[in-house]
């Protein structure tokens, strides 16, 4: 993977983490009894912890392997070269010399 591809992969991951961060509600404030406010804060804290765990998994997820089967096949095709070509035969087979022998009739 080139450095440009790595940077692009990192940008994608950071954009995904940023999107997740935007989806979570802001820190809870507002009216309610002390118990209601406490419960809202606890729920918010649990969601925030889940977001952090998910972001950590996204960020630390290993990069895809650089040598996928397609990449390996392309590399092998690029390395192909004709090393030695045998000399053509000096004598011609009889079937090629005499068109009546070995050839099929058009009615067959």
UniProtKB/Swiss-Prot annotation:
Residues 16-25 are annotated as: Homomultimerization. Residues 83-108 are annotated as: Disordered. Gene3D superfamilies: 6.10.140.630. One of its GO terms (biological process) is mRNA transport. InterPro entries: REV_protein. It holds the Pfam family REV. The keyword RNA-binding applies. Keywords: Host cytoplasm, Host nucleus, mRNA transport, RNA-binding, Transport. A motif (Nuclear localization signal and RNA-binding (RRE)) lies at residues 33-49. Coiled coil: none annotated. A motif (Nuclear export signal) lies at residues 70-82. One of its GO terms (molecular function) is DNA-binding transcription factor activity. GO terms for cellular component: host cell cytoplasm; host cell nucleolus. Signal peptide: none annotated. It comes from the Viruses. It is found in: Host nucleus, Host nucleolus; Host cytoplasm. Homomultimer; when bound to the RRE. Multimeric assembly is essential for activity. The RNA-binding motif binds to the RRE, a stem-and-loop structure present in incompletely spliced viral pre-mRNAs. This region also contains the NLS which mediates nuclear localization. These overlapping functions prevent Rev bound to RRE from undesirable return to the nucleus. When Rev binds the RRE, the NLS becomes masked while the NES remains accessible. This is Protein Rev. It comes from Simian immunodeficiency virus (isolate Mm251) (SIV-mac). The gene is rev.
